[in-house]
């Protein structure tokens, strides 16, 4: 050992030299990425991909270029050599050299023009039939691309078909961002072989949680909804949230995938928060039993009994402590009596991260 040089410094130098050497067999592959829907989620994902670009390359051997962007309003553009996202919005609107194609046939054609390896699907939820998102995913898999979505509809209405199609094509159909943003619920259970999920309960809709909190503070339902909309938490049309549809779709997705029991939305007993009064909500909080919109599912024989409804929960319980835009879920399995996950006030980056993580899983 050189005189006067601490051992830790020698180790650090050795590590730096080792990590700077080319890794044997470490092949970097470039993937063509396409974004279908370019609203908040996919825009945030694009930013996150840029932020993590070097790390993806260094740690996972993943390089990428964005070769296609499509929106319902503006049509689509594709360039297999790569698009400059900083100019995509202007290109969609005005650049005649890459004028967006609005042919309704064409998700498959667009993917072919972009030479897509990955589709990131983030279009609006259709609770009735999961369309057109299910067709988008079907087109991607038939084209030969991995399909990654943040849309819950295809999971509820076409999961087994799309899963089997992906397997037949040797591709991945992944959807981690559909429930609790980017929390890895589906991949978590995928890593638990032979575990059997018996049931779950939790709070999976953040909009109703915020509205109920504002009602506890004395606002009427309408005023609380308006405040949530002004904060950007509730949509202009918040029907899916306040009438329990969003929570029911998430419940159905969890049952379908994790319990392997296909369930229709009409099979889930559903009640929203629209009928709750400010007095009832305030009194519940005062008495230590606040209202929450609770999702429940329990295996019964070969089926599952499921519900979404406002319930009074003990304020000191895990569900009672959920506030703001946070979420909570508790799983009962045959071997683990209870597994709980809490997500604290996630933002768009959490949802985007779930899609990025699915990308890494798909190509690894």
Language-model regions, residue ranges each:
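Conserved active-site and cofactor/substrate-binding residues in soluble primary-metabolism enzymes
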Residues: 36, 40, 44, 64, ...
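Rossmann-fold NAD(P)-binding glycine/threonine-rich loop
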Residues: 126-139, 152-175, 188
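Substrate-binding/catalytic subdomain of NAD(P)-dependent oxidoreductase enzymes
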Residues: 214, 225-321, 326
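ATP-dependent carboxylate/acyl-activation modules
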Residues: 318-364
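N-terminal glycine-/serine-/threonine-rich beta1-alpha1-beta2 phosphate-ribose binding loop
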Residues: 11, 25-142
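Rossmann-like NAD(P)H-binding beta-loop-alpha module
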Residues: 167-234, 245-246
